[in-house]
């Protein structure tokens, strides 16, 4: 029964990616951990492949509709993808099984990664829901370029650490620095998620035993969801999309924090 629920969750992952341009991993990691019973390390690796492949199909559809800013996608993807690969290939395998202990209290690696995941989600949601001050577009602001590139590198490290495609981090950055309208930010986010996720997954392949049968089936179901989501997105306005995305990320972060702290 739980397994069937998990596959319905796969459709929901694609649906959310199609509507909001992010949030796939916010669903994928909890579904894989809490419903499909994978450990968080394996779930984060699988999440990168599922979300990356699903986003690739969404990117192709958005490209045909001219809802992608290619130059911005490259500028944002390049520094973050370096951070993702370094983290998945070198940093994750080096994190000890017990990250912290004090007396009888122990913080396992898996719990630590889920807590980091939830905290980053919470902060990104608050950023999305707050009213933004006007900023100079990234491509026109030479003084801010280096700072933004450094920030995106660390975004890549966070994406790699928590096994997320990073849409919930990338979309706020696209809105703030690139000044893209929400629907174009969604399309551009999907191509950045594709690059970040699949490069991150390559860093996992040598360190993880992959159940390809399960992974490909789950991903195929998620791809169906993204086509449904892209269809629904056409009928939603920009402000509503932004609010839906921010509230969704906020709610999921609170659920994961509660689950990890009190379970």
What does each of the following model-derived ranges do?
Residues 28-42, 169-184:
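Interfacial segments of multi-pass membrane proteins
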Residues 141-182:
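Transmembrane alpha-helical segments that form core, pore/gating elements
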Residues 20-73:
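Juxtamembrane transmembrane-helix termini in multi-pass membrane transport proteins
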Residues 21, 25, 39, 69, ...:
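A helix-boundary/kink motif common to multi-pass secondary transporters
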Residues 1-9, 13, 34, 63-156, ...:
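Juxtamembrane transmembrane-helix boundary motif
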Residues 16-25, 159-166:
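Short helix-coil transition sites and intra-membrane helix breaks within transmembrane domains
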Residues 14-15, 31, 35, 59, ...:
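Alpha-helical transmembrane segments of multipass membrane proteins
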């Amino acid at each position: 029964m739980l397994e069937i629920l998990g596959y319905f969750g796969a459709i929901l992952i694609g649906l959310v990616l199609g509507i909001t341009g992010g949030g796939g991993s916010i669903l994928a990691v909890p579904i894989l951990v809490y419903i499909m019973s994978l450990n968080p390390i394996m779930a984060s690796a699988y999440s990168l492949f599922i979300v990356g492949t699903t986003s690739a199909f969404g990117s192709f559809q958005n490209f045909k509709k001219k809802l992608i800013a290619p130059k911005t996608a490259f500028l944002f993807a390049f520094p973050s993808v370096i951070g993702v690969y370094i983290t998945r290939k070198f940093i994750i395998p080096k994190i000890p099984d017990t990250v912290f202990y004090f007396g009888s209290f122990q913080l396992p690696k898996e719990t630590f990664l889920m807590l980091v995941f939830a905290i980053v989600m919470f902060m990104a949601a608050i950023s999305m829901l707050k009213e933004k001050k006007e900023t100079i577009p990234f491509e026109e602001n030479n003084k801010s370029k280096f700072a933004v590139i450094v920030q995106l590198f660390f975004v890549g490290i966070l994406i790699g650490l928590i096994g997320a495609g990073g849409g919930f981090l990338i979309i706020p950055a696209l809105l703030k620095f690139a000044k893209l309208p929400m629907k174009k930010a969604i399309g551009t986010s999907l191509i950045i998620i594709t690059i970040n996720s699949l490069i991150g997954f390559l860093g996992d392949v040598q360190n993880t035993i992959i159940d390809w049968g399960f992974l490909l089936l789950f991903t195929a179901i998620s791809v169906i969801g993204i086509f449904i989501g892209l269809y629904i997105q056409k009928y939603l306005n920009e402000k509503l999309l932004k609010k839906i995305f921010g509230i969704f990320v906020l709610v999921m972060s609170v659920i994961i924090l509660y689950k990890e702290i009190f379970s």
